[in-house]
Amino acid sequence: ALIAYIQQEIETREQYKSSVITEAVTRGLYPSVPMKESGIDWLGEIPMLWETKRIAAFYQLRNEKVSDKDFPPLSVTKQGVLPQLETVAKTDDGDNRKLVRKGDFAINSRSDRRGSCGISDYDGSVSLINIVLKPRDKANNKYYNWLFHTEQFADEFYKWGNGIVDDLWTTRWQNMKKIIIPVPPIEEQQQIADYLDKKCKEIEEIIADRQSQIETLESYKKSLIYEYVTGKKEVG
């Protein structure tokens, strides 16, 4: 029962984190500011001083094919863009991956990989199923990284996809670039990014602590069962 209770707390905090991100990137940090209709279904109301523009105003496609022998293989995951495990086999069929430069944003184009995206901290290569974007000078990459991680953006992104099977839709850049996104004043974009970096780190630390508690309890439970089964501890 205690493990189930802690698990429920973790889920509640995950939901809270998600709502904190969505609120900050779509409505800002100041609840008292006047709002206006954005005219965009997935956004709804936005602060009066914010604008809206297409993604293409802030990102351009990087579409250079390379080999993972020349550029270390990276994986685009829900946790961001990470070095691929050494156990994953290297390919032998030439330039069959996409180049990623440090600071690029990558997102998996397939709907069954929903939420897999992030800014790369590395130069490397990713599989062709990913869209790799180079931020333009006027893009605050960290703010948009938070925006692109929201459920609302994921819904909109995959809505622009094509496919026969619902859970295997693929969204191409020629459609993604048309998606309209919020544009807060540049200094506010930085404030939002900094706030979310700090706030989400705090939430994640609590979640990690609770997960550690579950592991400790599970381990204790297993050791008790082992002792009873082996007769080292008597019932009653």
Model-inferred region functions:
Residues 106-107:
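Hydrophobic beta-strand signal
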Residues 37-66, 190, 213:
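Non-catalytic DNA-recognition/assembly elements of restriction-modification systems
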Residues 30-31, 118-119, 164-170:
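Short beta-strand/turn micro-motifs at beta-sheet edges
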Residues 1-33, 183-236:
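Amphipathic alpha-helical coiled-coil/heptad-repeat segments
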Residues 39, 56-102:
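Sequence-specific dsDNA recognition surfaces
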Residues 110, 124-131, 164-190:
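A short glycine-rich beta-alpha junction/loop motif
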Residues 69-78, 98-99, 117-128, 137-138:
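Short, surface-exposed loop/turn microsegments at beta-strand edges and helix-strand junctions
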Residues 111-115:
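Short, charged beta-turn/beta-strand-edge "cap" motif at the junction between a beta-strand
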